[in-house]
């Protein structure tokens, strides 16, 4: 599964180094400030039975798109690459001085040999 974690980070410049904040995350609520354009064929879990989707997503109870998990639903062979998940990401908020936007991607997987043991 994959989760996108959008953050603003203080730049690695002299002023931020002097203030001892270079590289640190800016404390900011990102809800409603990030737009994702998903690849073709990425569908909501509820409609996954209707298509031949490789990626499905499951919304969180909060409804915040930044809390959404994406699942690749096919096993990959060693060296094989999954279908594309994300085409584009846009940050729509204000950037505080000496900061930049980062999209951190958290990914987890299981070995194909473990599939028989999944419940």
Tell me the role of every PLM-derived stretch.
Residues 1-119:
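Surface-exposed, hydrophilic segments of mature proteins
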């Amino acid at each position: 599964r994959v989760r996108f974690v959008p953050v603003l980070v203080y730049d690695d410049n002299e002023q931020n180094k002097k203030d001892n904040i270079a590289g640190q995350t800016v404390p900011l609520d990102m809800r409603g400030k990030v737009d994702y354009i998903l690849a073709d064929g990425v569908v909501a879990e509820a409609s996954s039975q209707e298509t031949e989707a490789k990626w499905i997503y499951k919304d969180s109870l909060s409804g915040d798109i930044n809390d959404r998990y994406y699942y690749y639903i096919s096993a990959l062979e060693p060296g094989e690459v999954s279908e594309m998940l994300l085409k584009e990401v846009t940050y729509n908020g204000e950037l505080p001085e000496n900061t930049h936007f980062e999209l951190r991607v958290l990914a987890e997987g299981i070995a194909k040999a473990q599939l028989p043991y999944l419940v």
